[in-house]
Amino acid sequence: YPSLRAHAREGFPYPEPEKLKSIVKRGAPVIRTWLRAGNGFSVPYPADGRDSRSCDPVEKWVGEGKATEASAHLVQLLEQDDPRPLWIAVWGGPMDLAQALWQVRHKHSAEASRRMISRIRYYQVSWQDTGAVWLWENFPELFRLQSQFVSRGIYREGPPALRDEAWLRANVVEHHGALGASYPAAGANGKHTLQVKEGDSASFLYLLAPGLSDPNEPEWGGGGGRFRHFDSTSSRFVDARDRNPSSDEVDRESTWTMGRWNEAIANDFAARMNWCVQPPSAANHPPVAHLDGDASRRVLRRTVRAGETIALTAAGTTDPDRDRLTYRWWLYSEPGTFEGELRLEGQDTASVTLVAPVVSTPATAHLILEVTDSGQPRLTSYRRIVLTFTPR
């Protein structure tokens, strides 16, 4: 902790260990048994789907008198007079969230319940337990990201050399303190091997891509993948698809929405593990990317008319370690509605220009700025601008 604290970005200190321990709450001891793929409990998405586990029925853990420390804590957070969204990353099972929302619905007025539920932003990795099914069926109004294949992109896509045992030993497990030494082996078919799995990390990484994404816009994509509306009447989102350069299989196009960022994620992971044991002068830190004079970490937007020349710059971008920086501008096609090509002049420099294309109706294009340093490991920072092209 003392070493990590020395690497904290100004204004964003690492929380004290005791603070983290104080907010860990015990949840329901739901019993789940691994079976085989497709042999577990029924799930509503995809159609006729089944999980890979058996699980206690939801009635055992949701209802009157079934509150846990965890569910009570969630209710307490929702009852606070706080306008901010409450993000809930679910990767171990949402039964306590199900109990919390049962209590919200049964112990509060309809208006208070509606207001509390509207604050929730919920990322669900796979189905995990029967509580996830119950929430889907009973709370369709929840802002929910339901990952089927997206979250698997962290271990199915990208350079294999960034997720094998040799990489883990060199960058995480060995000579990286107590945290690195505790990295778990992945189990499969009774075998335990040291490899990057991180299959549930998407639910957290989704919130950790400042400048690249906006968590409130699942269709835009980012470090935790990209999603699309499940239907036109709810706030539920399911796997989207990006063109995968290695495969046109549906699941591989979904995993690629996360996998396309894997090299940057792996290098960031390695750098942070170095922070555990190295002083700031010996470790690498990410660049601070500026976009058109904006030093914040928000996504920018601009509306331009067809035929108008657009000039964008990364001037002002800095690196904490004074490393040499390289730049790359590129069109992230899938989130936008513009379906053509954009000619980017200077796409490998700090400034880029393009001409807004002719369109018959307004269309959007997502332009990404990547800034990568020359340190070890090489770290990348992102900015995004959403351009809306309008007719003349």
Locate predicted features:
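Short, surface-exposed loop/turn segments at beta-strand-coil junctions that are enriched for proline
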Residues: 355-361
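Short, solvent-exposed loop/turn segments at the edges of extracellular beta-sandwich modules
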Residues: 372-378
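Extracellular and select intracellular beta-sandwich modules with Ser/Thr-enriched
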Residues: 378-385
